[in-house]
Amino acid sequence: SFFGILLWLKKEEEIDFFTAFFGGGPAYICYFFQCLQNMLEKKNIKKKVSIELIVTLFNGTINFIEKEKIEFKDLIKRVASKGGTTEKALKYFSQNNRFDSVITTAINKAENRSKELSKNQS
């Protein structure tokens, strides 16, 4: 597929989670991009420039991860200096599992919707 790889599932019931997580994945990522773009535009950065900056940021990050074969947590450690700006933002994200909780809840809702749609087709 254009967005991913082919993966055979061991159990048919796993399809709902994979549909929710990976089927919607490009939209979730673009939603995050859109949030970043909105922030940049509020800082008077033009739309075209903001899109280029965001795409370059994500492409560079992905390319680095692939080239260095580095785990996400290790790249975070390399970027987030102790007491620095990135660490401050990451602490806010992780307070009460804030960011993780939003993502997990959203994917769970999508998974439940996939199950509902499957039942309606039976």
Task: Walk through the language-model features, giving the residues of each.
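Internal alpha-helical scaffold of NAD(P)-dependent oxidoreductase catalytic cores
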Residues: 1-18, 28-69, 113, 117
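Alpha-helical membrane segments and immediately flanking helix-loop junctions
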Residues: 21-22
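NAD(P)-dependent Rossmann-like dehydrogenase/reductase catalytic/cofactor-binding core
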Residues: 51-122
